[in-house]
């Protein structure tokens, strides 16, 4: 279960609750949840190509998607209102920055 909000909560049966706090209040806009679902879908598809995706992994991927979503919104907003198209456009650069930082 993924509950999107200022802090996004993700939990799987028997697993710990994961909380992503990277969101900006500007994500309370039409289509933002769809963008988050798309990011999560891409992560799940990428991992499914390697092996099975169990509920615990799905929860971790949900939390990772929420972090990417929130950071992309911060990148796109520059502190002000943002559209979902701006958030989506910022996703590749956000993922690249996260990969460089690891």
Regions found by a protein language model. Name each.
Residues 1-102:
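Small-residue (G/A/S/T)-rich helix-start motifs and N-terminal tracts that mark the onset
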